[in-house]
């Protein structure tokens, strides 16, 4: 018999009312759930049959495990009491017991009762790639129909969303709004109620949720300001500065005064803010501490000013009018969502599909029809696992099935709620936790998973940062993890924090976006690899729970967790493999980027249209055609002009060996082209496999089984595609890219728990798992805060649209968007903190934290300066200002007076330090460029070029497949001045497509700032900085932009001849949008002679009008020089020519000149 703790026993045996069990990580909640079911069916008086219990789990795997464990326990007890008929009865009932996911339970309700209520009972579940594709298809059809009708509301909405280039923002907004509404019990009502919030029907603004949010946020920031001033006052006291001490005390009183005014109302607070003046700071000459105290006070004053600009810059009397004005955009948006919902349902019904959301909504409708009474009678108790991840719709279903919630047994841990992006509502759990009496809630805080050192580290960090106002819950004594596992002592099981100093500046790509700090990703990977090898070499041992003995560490005992692997999975794979460590990287991105799938997609493109040079080159230099790079060069050299396909046909006319190879490939291509018109796409894929032997060839590669499984998955996706679309290679390739982006998409996986490999996975993938040794990496990577949204969405607060003046083309925060963006930022931070908690609590015996920090010494000094004023925790403001995990962990570990536990060791790796394994060179990354007539030499190293060729996505399409709309940026390759391809070695090392998650904002931030400059204002560096501060306060720019924008370099623009011309111009049009019809043949040579046009949308950075015509300026943030800059200029020339043509056609005036201005290079280039 297991020795249950008192709280576990209470969770097993308590009866008579609803019960909420808050089970900390590693608390054994599954065992408790199993035992509660067993006690219900075997020992209750009277006992309950197992088919009269409803057990709801989060995943099918969890449901299967639950049934298996119940079966094992029942058999075990039957062996102990062979004649027990009660146990036999429950074993017989177990297969039909309702132990399933909520979706499976809803499906069962529909199958049993649906026909009576008018619902189809036979349908296929639509999920993953097929669901994504069908949604996009329906949405595209709706918008195309409106484009054709010239829908004015749609065009106004596109202008409002700054979507003139393309309608990507609108599509994303419609789908997000659709999903938001569907997570509610009544989607239509939620949409209309959210819209009605903008009718301005309130008596006092102070009675609205808008003001409640303003008041709550302001109070949080006031606490932070007081903490800063308190620290400055402590410095003044330390250095005996009585005048400064007195002044800071006055400052604090002025700040506290705002608390009272907030209670009086909006206008009272606004008036008070306008009257507050801070005195002049003074400090004794030659006395230390001045800079520290002044810096703290300046930060406090800056934050106080931000409160004024962020929340109290509006006129309360204008709120109603402004919000009502915004309905002119929200109303057509809601109409589009409702139309999409209706037509998407029709499309699903036509194909015989239902998605998971349908299951829940249909089941709820059926329950409401009266069926709930029968089910309430049937189920004695409903047990819900992972209750923290429930949403509003699911809660409603459970309420109906249960006896108004009175026979619900709910288990979860709100600290592990990390699925808000899937509409989870942790606040449902939190509200019950706050409302329930002690008799109705139980804390399971004993952790049976982790060593004491890990528990101490987790408690040490989270007791200081997890606070109710900023994290939605408090990490108090009740939440503390407590040791429940008995491990034998091991002196090497302390937790570790490794801080790597990152390089100070990022490389900039052609879109003005910083490339991801390769040094950071690679150095973290190398440090981890070196640490793994060291653990192995030193004979690190882990405790084996089966044998109850220590054994040597194996690779399968190790996991590497990252918040996201979207841009770094390949790096981890390469670096660990290079170190000789067997590794498996989880993630969908690796599917489309795998060699075998890249080759197949390239081949399909060539079959569809061979006039695509890059895919054709990739196929030719693959096992399909078998050409070497030397031979490819020979083909092109003999026919240097025109398409590579024409060059290949020309070569096939000869008699030499290369000509024979070319001829055989062309024959194979023609055969597949004929087959593509006669058989299904899935059959075509099969034929390609059969005739080329690609599965066998890739089976011989390293990881061959996974590669073969990927090829099979590609075939399966072709089958799926056929069910929702008649076919077509181009459409299938679109479907494939959407499939990889789907949250539910899983690439081929051929790995089990017994495989001795290190696993690399996202924190979300690790939920519910545990490992002896856990590395948590990327702690310095910035959180994602999307400030660029024009409309923010929130499940409780509804819409948060920005205000837009169509005449001045100015967007700024409305009261609604300001409040929602702030609320969403806080909720994002709370979720990120829970993600960190999940990551740290996966470890059983060894926890190693790794992060990269720029300006490490300065950062550490900042962390250390946060002194005793912080007391036991960081302030709410300090926590709320975090941009990454290290912004929490750093101050916790380094601040003065921090009681760092002995079980946590910190190691710092400066920029100049060579990390063990640093002698490995960075993998050479080659660029695919449009072909120049570069001499070919035997010495040239073409390592990696085959892959680079496969990765390139070239937009050559048949006329039948031409897009109806495209953006100017889509045309970059089309307008390039070179016309053939090259796989040319470059000295520079770049990794295309890999960006800082925060760095991707840099180009956007520069453009947002430059389009909003007051050209009549102060254009000095300080003046521009002040303009930037205003835009940050208004929410137009993110706070991070303070560090991202170089105001000195921007100021220098206006000292140049070009800048002076801009200032003297008669008219200046920042961000000038245009739409231009272009004949398809001008973009795609294969369309020459056709009358079809393509609608091209774009935005010109700056258009200036002088007496004799216009000139154009395009801002660039590239940091490249020399040959690479010349290549970029060729790419940009076509875009600028199109800009000029658009302006001339629209205005009838001549465009005299076109300029590129490279801000970081401080260089203007006339094109």
Curated annotation (Swiss-Prot):
Pfam families membership: PDDEXK_1, UvrD-helicase, UvrD_C
A biological process term (GO) from this entry: double-strand break repair via homologous recombination
Family annotation (InterPro entries): AddA (IPR014152), DNA_helicase_UvrD-like_C (IPR014017), DNA_helicase_UvrD/REP (IPR000212), P-loop_NTPase (IPR027417), PDDEXK-like_dom_sf (IPR011604), PDDEXK_AddAB-type (IPR038726), Restrct_endonuc-II-like (IPR011335), UvrD-like_ATP-bd (IPR014016)
Domain UvrD-like helicase ATP-binding: 2-451
EC number: 3.1.-.-, 5.6.2.4
One GO MF term attached to the UniProt entry: ATP binding
Domain spans labelled UvrD-like helicase C-terminal: 478-768
HAMAP family: AddA
Protein family: Belongs to the helicase family. AddA subfamily.
Function as written in the Swiss-Prot or TrEMBL entry: The heterodimer acts as both an ATP-dependent DNA helicase and an ATP-dependent, dual-direction single-stranded exonuclease. Recognizes the chi site generating a DNA molecule suitable for the initiation of homologous recombination. The AddA nuclease domain is required for chi fragment generation; this subunit has the helicase and 3' -> 5' nuclease activities.
Name of the protein: ATP-dependent helicase/nuclease subunit A
């Amino acid at each position: 018999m297991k020795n249950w703790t008192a709280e576990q026993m209470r969770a097993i045996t308590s009866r008579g009312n609803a019960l909420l069990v808050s089970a900390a990580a590693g608390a054994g909640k599954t065992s408790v759930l199993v035992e509660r079911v067993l006690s219900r069916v075997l020992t209750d008086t009277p006992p309950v049959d197992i088919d009269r219990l409803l057990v709801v789990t989060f995943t099918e795997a969890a449901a299967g495990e639950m049934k298996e464990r119940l079966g094992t326990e029942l058999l075990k007890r039957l062996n102990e009491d062979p004649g027990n008929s009660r146990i036999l009865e429950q074993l017989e009932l177990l297969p039909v017991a309702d132990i399933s996911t909520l979706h499976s339970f809803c499906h069962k309700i529909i199958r049993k009762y649906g026909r009576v209520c008018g619902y189809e009972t036979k349908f296929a579940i639509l999920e993953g790639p097929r669901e994504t594709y069908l949604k996009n298809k329906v949405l595209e059809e709706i918008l195309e129909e409106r484009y054709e009708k010239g829908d004015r509301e749609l065009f106004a909405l596109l202008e409002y969303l700054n979507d003139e280039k393309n309608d990507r923002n609108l599509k994303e907004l419609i789908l997000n709004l659709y999903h938001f509404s569907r997570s509610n019990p009544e989607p239509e009502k939620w949409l209309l109620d959210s819209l009605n919030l903008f009718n301005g029907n309130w008596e006092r603004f102070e009675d609205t949720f808008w003001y409640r949010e303003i008041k709550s946020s302001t109070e949080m920031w006031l606490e932070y300001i007081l903490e800063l001033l308190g620290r400055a006052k402590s410095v003044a006291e330390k250095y005996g500065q009585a005048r400064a001490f007195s002044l800071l005390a006055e400052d604090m009183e002025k700040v506290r005064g705002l608390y009272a005014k907030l209670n009086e109302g909006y206008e009272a607070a606004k008036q008070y803010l306008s009257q507050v003046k801070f005195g002049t700071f003074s400090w004794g000459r030659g006395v230390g501490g001045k800079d520290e105290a002044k810096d703290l006070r300046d930060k406090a004053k800056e934050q106080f000013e931000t409160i004024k600009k962020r929340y109290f810059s509006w006129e309360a009397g204008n709120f109603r009018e402004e919000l009502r004005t915004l309905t002119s955009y929200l109303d057509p948006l809601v109409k589009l969502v409702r139309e999409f919902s209706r037509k998407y349902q029709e499309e699903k019904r036509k194909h015989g599909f239902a998605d998971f959301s349908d299951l829940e909504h249909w089941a709820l409708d059926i329950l409401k029809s009266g069926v709930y009474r029968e089910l309430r009678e049937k189920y004695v108790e409903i047990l819900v696992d992972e209750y923290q991840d429930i949403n509003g719709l699911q809660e409603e279903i459970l309420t109906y099935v249960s006896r108004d919630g009175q026979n619900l047994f709910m288990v979860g841990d709100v600290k592990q709620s990390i699925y808000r992006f899937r509409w989870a509502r942790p606040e449902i759990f939190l509200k019950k936790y706050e409302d329930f009496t002690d008799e109705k809630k139980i804390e399971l805080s004993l952790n049976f998973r982790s060593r004491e050192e890990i528990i101490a580290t987790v408690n040490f960090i989270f007791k200081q940062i997890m606070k109710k106002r900023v994290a939605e819950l408090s990490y108090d004594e009740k939440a503390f993890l407590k040791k429940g596992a008995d491990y034998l002592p091991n002196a090497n099981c302390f937790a570790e924090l490794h801080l790597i100093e990152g390089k100070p500046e990022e490389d900039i790509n052609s879109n003005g976006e910083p490339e991801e700090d390769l040094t950071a990703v690679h150095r973290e990977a190398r440090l981890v690899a070196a640490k793994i090898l060291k653990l192995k070499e030193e004979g690190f041992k882990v405790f084996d729970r089966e044998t109850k003995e220590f054994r040597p560490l194996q690779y399968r005992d190790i996991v590497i967790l990252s918040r996201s692997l979207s841009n770094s999975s390949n790096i981890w794979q390469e670096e660990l493999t290079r170190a000789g460590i067997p590794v498996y990287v989880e993630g969908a991105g690796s599917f489309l980027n795998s060699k075998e799938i890249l080759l197949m997609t390239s081949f399909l493109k060539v079959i569809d249209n061979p006039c695509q040079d890059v895919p054709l080159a990739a196929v030719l230099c693959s096992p399909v055609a078998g050409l070497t790079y030397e031979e490819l060069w020979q083909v092109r050299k003999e026919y240097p002009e025109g398409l590579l396909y024409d060059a290949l046909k020309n070569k096939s006319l000869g008699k030499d060996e290369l000509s024979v190879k070319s001829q055989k490939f062309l024959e194979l291509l023609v055969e597949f082209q004929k087959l593509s018109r006669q058989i299904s796409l899935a059959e075509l894929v099969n034929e390609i496999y059969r005739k080329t032997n690609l599965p066998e060839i890739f089976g011989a590669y390293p990881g061959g089984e996974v590669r073969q499984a990927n090829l099979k998955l590609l075939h399966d996706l072709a089958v799926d595609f056929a069910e929702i679309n008649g076919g077509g290679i181009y459409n299938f390739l679109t479907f494939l890219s959407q499939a990889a982006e789907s949250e539910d998409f899983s690439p081929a996986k051929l790995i089990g728990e017994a495989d001795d490999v290190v696993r690399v996975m996202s924190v979300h993938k690790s939920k519910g798992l545990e490992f002896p040794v856990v590395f948590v990496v990327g702690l310095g990577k910035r959180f994602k805060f999307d400030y660029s949204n024009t409309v923010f969405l929130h499940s409780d607060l509804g819409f948060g649209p920005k205000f837009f003046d169509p005449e001045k083309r100015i967007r700024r925060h409305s009261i609604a968007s300001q409040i929602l963006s702030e609320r969403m930022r806080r909720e994002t931070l709370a979720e990120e903190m829970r993600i960190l908690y999940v990551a740290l609590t996966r470890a059983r015996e060894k926890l190693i934290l790794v992060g990269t920090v720029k300006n490490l010494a300065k950062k550490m000094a900042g962390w250390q300066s946060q002194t005793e004023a912080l007391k036991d925790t960081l302030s709410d403001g300090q926590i709320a200002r975090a941009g990454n995990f290290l912004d929490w962990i750093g101050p916790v570990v380094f601040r003065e007076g921090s009681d760092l536990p002995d079980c946590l060791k910190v190691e710092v790796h400066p920029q100049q330090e060579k990390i063990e394994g640093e002698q490995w060179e960075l993998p050479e990354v080659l660029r695919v460029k449009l072909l120049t007539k570069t001499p070919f030499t035997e010495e040239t190293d073409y390592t990696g070029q085959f892959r680079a060729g496969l990765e390139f996505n070239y937009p050559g399409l048949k006329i039948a497949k031409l897009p109806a709309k495209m953006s100017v940026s889509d045309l970059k390759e089309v307008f390039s001045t070179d016309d053939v391809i090259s796989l040319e070695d470059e000295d520079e090392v770049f990794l295309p497509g890999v960006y800082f998650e925060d760095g991707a904002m840099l180009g956007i931030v520069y453009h947002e700032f430059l389009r909003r400059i007051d050209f009549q204002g102060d254009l000095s560096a300080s003046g521009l900085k002040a303009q930037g501060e205003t835009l940050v306060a208004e929410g137009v720019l993110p706070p991070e932009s303070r560090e991202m924008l170089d105001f000195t370099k921007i100021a220098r623009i206006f000292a140049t001849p070009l800048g002076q011309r801009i200032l003297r111009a008669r008219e200046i049009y920042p961000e000038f949008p245009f739409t231009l019809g272009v004949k398809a043949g001008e973009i795609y040579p294969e369309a020459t002679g056709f009358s079809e046009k393509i609608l091209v949308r774009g935005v010109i950075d700056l258009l200036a009008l002088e007496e004799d015509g216009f000139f154009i300026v395009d801002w660039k943030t590239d940091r490249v020089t020399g040959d690479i800059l010349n290549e970029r200029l060729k790419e940009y020339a076509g875009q600028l020519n199109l800009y000029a043509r658009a302006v001339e056609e629209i205005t009838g005036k001549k465009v005299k000149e076109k300029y590129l201005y490279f801000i970081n290079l401080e260089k203007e280039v006339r094109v």
